[in-house]
Amino acid sequence: MKAVVFAYHDMGCTGIQSLLDAGYDIAAIFTHPDNPGENHFFGSVARLAAEQGIPVWAPEDVNHPLWIERIREMKPDVLFSFYYRNLLGDEILNLAPKGAFNLHGSLLPKYRGRAPLNWVLVNGESETGVTLHRMVNRADAGDIVAQQTVAIGPDDAALTLHRKLCAAATELLGQALPAILEGKTAERPQDHSQATYVGRRTPEDGRLDWEQPAQTLHNLVRAVSDPWPGAFGYAGANKFIVWKSRVRHDLPAAKPGTVISVAPLIVACQDGALEIVTGQTERGVYMQGAQLAQALGLVSGAVISSKPVVAIKRRTRVLILGVNGFIGNHLTERLLQDDNYEIYGLDIGSDAISRFLESPRFHFVEGDISIHSEWIEYHIKKCDVVLPLVAIATPIEYTRNPLRVFELDFEENLKIIRDCVKYNKRIIFPSTSEVYGMCTDKNFDEDTSNLVVGPINKQRWIYSVSKQLLDRVIWAYGDKYDLKFTLFRPFNWMGPRLDNLNAARIGSSRAITQLILNLVEGSPIKLIEGGKQKRCFTDISDGIEALFRIIENKDGRCDGQIINIGNPENEASIKELAEMLLACFERHPLRDRFPPFAGFREVESSDYYGKGYQDVEHRKPSIRNAKRCLNWEPKVEMEETVEHTLDFFLRTVELVDDKNP
């Protein structure tokens, strides 16, 4: 049986050797290049493949059409994945008639996801194991072919458990692979209701929080001990690593973080104390706890912490161009809630940000980005993070004023990008969901989806291609000149202060604002092409929280990333949005102040937008990058967003009426 294998790490070597022992014909092996930032204590899949005379590749994107075609030409009967770090797309999974199988380091359905070996130790589990399962388009969710349980001893650390799992995998594969070869597997579906999920771990996750129970910290030490990066704490500004520990409950309670003893080195925790058996200073050598205490200058009664004691950090300076806009004013509000940020803003108006003008951390100048280029360059040089939020982003303007869209959205923003390169400043650039155009994917993926636009005579695409070209320019500057950047793509953000009713009166607004104007004025709601187009509507509070986390950029996770920010659960057609809005309007306490509902009216897009318009049937984001980089998921349901948005505009109208009797 011909197999194509995707493998890495010791488990990859174990899987390949087991396949060879079982008599499989391995046509090719796909692996990863070694990361220079990792401790390479494990076996090399590439070396094993070369020694066995098997072709081996390490592509950056194995799901690229070129690699899919090469694998198709190999005509594999079966696929195997052994600790390969990237998900395989459906096109690859469907290439093997006998199916695709993955070896996972836990007892599925528990601990789906990344680093299960470390997580079971962190959580103090008494057993784990390995699972061979069929691969489906959902990670770690396919039917189970075989499982092998591994007991976790009280003295097991990451490396000893890793070795146990490798041994268990050898035993499991020795039985399961011949069964697959003979077509005699007994598979069972997973109980998805029992599934648990764990995410990728980083060195920062090894931080010791002395406010936690001693057993919790001991489990963390076991989970990340050598050859993993280790659990760590700080004595003043000096970092130290703990390699081995034990829990002590035989000592008087003390304030968490207090050094109870230096020989042996014992530190008080919330419940019990942690004895540091072995460890090292950040640039030192492996040593016993008592010697570590000497190296750190610790004495009994001293207090150590989970963070370094350092001088007060300067606030991060954030430059927001277009600060009075929908995203800009909400982002300003969120940044001012955190004392770590100072905001510099430019816009042609200040009505939406007037509530911030008295803040000592908010510095505003009224101006136009096409005129105040010297001010902008000076503040790019002065600030740490730049967000150019100025753009014409309403569909009717794409056909009505295409050249103005190009001049502002592309040409003016290109100047800002080049200044960020010149002064080595981080740019967070607002791309758009429009760049995906007429992509046919079910979910638009930042890294794999094609960007599909219409013909030249459909000028509505000038906004999309202007943004797309800027995305590509920024990416190129990042690649060639190390520009620090993150591209974020909002998917139909809604909420208070989205456009205004005056803009809606001339057709230059987003959909919900136009619909609200129709209700307020008692004019028919116009449904373009019947309102069948589907969008995923995202509450502004969800969107801003994601954007705030991009600015935070913990551990640099957002550097060089493209991140969709949208709510795939809030998918609805424009007609459904209008019906939901109407229902909210009819039950609103201010309903009696407005005219009767004038009904729906279907219109052709060319009549409403002009002949240069072309619509998009659906626009649904994949948010895997947002989950991975930001630990973010949207929370607000669509109806709540619609209610808040409607309420804001109706009360705005009320205020205007009160001032103009």
Swiss-Prot record:
One of its GO terms (cellular component) is membrane. Pathway: Nucleotide-sugar biosynthesis; UDP-4-deoxy-4-formamido-beta-L-arabinose biosynthesis; UDP-4-deoxy-4-formamido-beta-L-arabinose from UDP-alpha-D-glucuronate: step 1/3; Nucleotide-sugar biosynthesis; UDP-4-deoxy-4-formamido-beta-L-arabinose biosynthesis; UDP-4-deoxy-4-formamido-beta-L-arabinose from UDP-alpha-D-glucuronate: step 3/3; Bacterial outer membrane biogenesis; lipopolysaccharide biosynthesis. It catalyses: UDP-alpha-D-glucuronate + NAD(+) = UDP-beta-L-threo-pentopyranos-4-ulose + CO2 + NADH; UDP-4-amino-4-deoxy-beta-L-arabinose + (6R)-10-formyltetrahydrofolate = UDP-4-deoxy-4-formamido-beta-L-arabinose + (6S)-5,6,7,8-tetrahydrofolate + H(+). Residues 1-304 are annotated as: Formyltransferase ArnAFT. The record marks 102 as: Transition state stabilizer. The keyword Nucleotidyltransferase does not apply. GO terms for biological process: lipid A biosynthetic process; lipopolysaccharide biosynthetic process; response to antibiotic. Residues 314-661 are annotated as: Dehydrogenase ArnADH. UDP-alpha-D-glucuronate binds at residues 393, 398, 432-433, 460, 492, 526-535, 613. The active site is at 104 (proton donor), 434 (proton acceptor), 619 (proton donor). The record marks 140 as: Raises pKa of active site His. One of its GO terms (molecular function) is UDP-glucuronate dehydrogenase activity. (6R)-10-formyltetrahydrofolate binds at residues 114, 136-140. Pfam families: Epimerase (PF01370), Formyl_trans_C (PF02911), Formyl_trans_N (PF00551). Homohexamer, formed by a dimer of trimers. PANTHER family: BIFUNCTIONAL POLYMYXIN RESISTANCE PROTEIN ARNA, UDP-D-APIOSE_UDP-D-XYLOSE SYNTHASE 2. This is Bifunctional polymyxin resistance protein ArnA. It comes from Klebsiella pneumoniae (strain 342). The lineage of its organism: Bacteria, Pseudomonadati, Pseudomonadota, Gammaproteobacteria, Enterobacterales.
